[in-house]
């Protein structure tokens, strides 16, 4: 019944989208993918706050339809050409020059759009039981004289529930726009616009008292870094007379100016990755964010910086990218080793996964500037799957036991065997076991890096070994042991059907990408080759 009401509420939006086409079915689909999440958010805003079941249905239905449409783009996509496809123009949104705003898809952006749609749908499914009677599904519990407040995803009031879904759908819209817009200035606007819904997700629905501080750190760190990019965009415009991506790819910028512009872009993108030493905001943001916030942060937002390097820094500023490549190698290796060693001394599960993300993104930046861009992009996608799944698993533990500290766990396999099995699969992915997706990406990066610089390749391989160490250590501390460390752990049930279904797509992707990576590499091979070897 609620799904029927949701469909009825979305009918005007779907009717409008059906009349946006310009003759090309791919362009029509791309327009729908861009606008449908935003229209779903608008529908939610005008619904009464008490209609919480309808809110959930509209949000999930909107996200699922967007995902299905993105699959149609994959089917229609021609992976043999590096050119942008399904180019669509919004003539009603005119820039000062009178040129319509253009959006398009290549092999790089297509897979990131698919990943975004998958993760948003999973986030909405994770929060499906939130908001009942104004509380989280994990309501206040008293066990062994210890009272704990159930926060779950932090959705505590009916108004907050609606705002939560609106924030996720707006975030999805902005992320898709970042990956498809064909203008540098608009890329910056959407790039920064992502901060707003993510700030609210962390600051309002975070799980602890320091969530406001974490939200401020996330917002200010990334905003300050992006100011350099704004100055660089102004310099590019005065140099080339345009911010259109096709014009930039054909422009010749002097070597001295390339060095300045590259550094400005670097600070902005490095904060988002994040690279050492600009990573301090990430562990704090992950620890305080709700599960859905951590999933989106690790799965997609960390990819924005690497995407910026691949989309703009390398093709537009090739000389500077080559000039500063050794510096990036050093910073990447430092990130891999430092973050991996930091994982071994953490006792908070979220911090372990957060520092693990810093290490894996170190492999990504190493590959981007170490002649392994395809491996770097593949690892970006894989990390989006594995890290998101690990944060979901940590969130499922937290919803039951109200703690993320390793010292309180042990013997979980006795009471949660299904969870322990799934957690084991993603632990294998995190330590880059063969036949999992991370192994393919990291092996490609290490192979090309070693051929480029043997010292960096060897040190990075050491980080891969450390990754296996902290992953096995974490899993052993949580799952095995003679009995649970805290008595009340034994009172909680294993995963329910909804929780299992939310992880099922990620399990499928983990092994599909690991066993048959060519299905994904074929999609972006031509595009990556074009970006890294501009004519």
Identify the meaning behind each predicted range.
Residues 21-29, 101-109, 185, 249-255, ...:
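Interfacial loop-to-helix junctions that mark the boundaries of transmembrane helices
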Residues 11-15, 31-48, 60-75, 113-130, ...:
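Central hydrophobic cores of alpha-helical transmembrane segments in multi-pass inner-membrane proteins
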Residues 2-29, 45-166:
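Transmembrane helix-loop-helix hairpins at membrane boundaries of multipass inner-membrane proteins
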Residues 45, 49-52, 71-81, 121-131, ...:
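Transmembrane helix-loop junctions and nearby membrane-interface residues
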Residues 7-8, 30-36, 40, 55-62, ...:
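Hydrophobic alpha-helical transmembrane segments of polytopic
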Residues 78-100, 135-137, 207, 211-213, ...:
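Juxtamembrane/interfacial segments at transmembrane-helix boundaries in multi-pass membrane proteins
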Residues 50-55, 80-83, 138-142, 163-257, ...:
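Alpha-helical multi-pass transmembrane bundles of energy-transducing inner-membrane proteins
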Residues 37, 106, 183-201, 271-318, ...:
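Functional transmembrane alpha-helices
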């Amino acid at each position: 019944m609620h799904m029927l009401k949701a469909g009825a509420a979305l009918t005007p939006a779907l009717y409008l989208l059906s009349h946006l086409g310009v003759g090309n079915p791919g362009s029509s689909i791309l327009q729908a993918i861009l606008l449908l999440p935003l229209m779903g958010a608008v529908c939610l805003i005008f619904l009464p706050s008490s209609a919480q079941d309808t809110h959930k249905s509209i949000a999930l239905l909107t996200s699922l339809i967007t995902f299905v449409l993105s699959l149609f783009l994959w089917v229609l996509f021609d992976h043999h050409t590096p050119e942008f496809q399904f180019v669509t123009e919004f003539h009603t949104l005119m820039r000062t020059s009178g040129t319509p705003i253009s959006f398009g898809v290549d092999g790089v952006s297509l897979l990131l759009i698919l990943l975004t749609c998958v993760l948003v749908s999973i986030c909405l499914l994770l929060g499906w039981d939130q908001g009942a009677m104004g509380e989280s599904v994990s309501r206040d519990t008293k066990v062994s004289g210890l009272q704990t407040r159930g926060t779950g995803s932090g959705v505590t009031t009916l108004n907050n529930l609606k705002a939560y879904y609106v924030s996720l759908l707006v975030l999805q819209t902005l992320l898709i726009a970042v990956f498809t817009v064909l203008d540098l200035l608009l890329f910056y606007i959407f790039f920064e616009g992502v901060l707003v819904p993510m700030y609210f997700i962390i600051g309002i629905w975070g799980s602890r008292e320091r969530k406001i501080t974490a939200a401020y750190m996330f917002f200010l760190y990334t905003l300050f870094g992006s100011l350099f990019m704004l100055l660089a965009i102004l310099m590019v415009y005065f140099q080339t007379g345009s911010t259109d991506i096709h014009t930039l790819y054909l422009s010749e910028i002097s070597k001295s100016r390339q060095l300045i512009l590259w550094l400005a872009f670097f600070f902005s993108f490095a904060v988002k990755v994040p690279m050492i030493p600009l990573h301090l905001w990430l562990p704090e943001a992950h620890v305080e964010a709700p599960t859905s916030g951590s999933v989106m942060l690790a799965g997609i937002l960390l990819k924005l910086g690497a995407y910026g390097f691949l989309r703009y820094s390398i093709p537009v500023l090739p000389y500077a990218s080559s000039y500063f490549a050794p510096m990036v190698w050093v910073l990447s290796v430092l990130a891999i080793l430092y973050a991996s060693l930091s994982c071994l001394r953490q006792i908070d599960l979220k911090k372990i996964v957060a520092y693990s993300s810093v290490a894996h993104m170190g492999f990504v930046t190493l590959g981007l500037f170490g002649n392994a861009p395809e491996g770097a992009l593949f690892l970006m996608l894989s990390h989006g799957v594995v890290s998101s799944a690990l944060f979901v698993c940590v969130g499922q533990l937290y919803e039951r036991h109200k703690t993320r500290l390793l010292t309180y766990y042990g013997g979980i396999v006795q009471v949660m065997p299904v969870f322990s099995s799934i957690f084991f699969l993603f632990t294998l992915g995190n330590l880059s076991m063969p036949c999992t997706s991370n192994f393919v990406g990291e092996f490609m990066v290490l192979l090309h890096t070693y051929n480029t610089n043997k010292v960096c390749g060897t040190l990075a391989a050491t980080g891969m070994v450390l990754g296996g160490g902290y992953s096995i250590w974490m899993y052993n501390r949580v799952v095995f042991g003679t009995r649970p460390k805290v008595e009340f752990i034994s009172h909680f049930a294993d995963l329910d059907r909804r929780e299992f279904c939310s992880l099922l797509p990620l399990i499928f992707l983990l092994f599909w990408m690991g066993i048959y990576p060519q299905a994904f590499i074929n999609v972006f091979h031509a595009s990556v080759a074009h970006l890294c070897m501009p004519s």
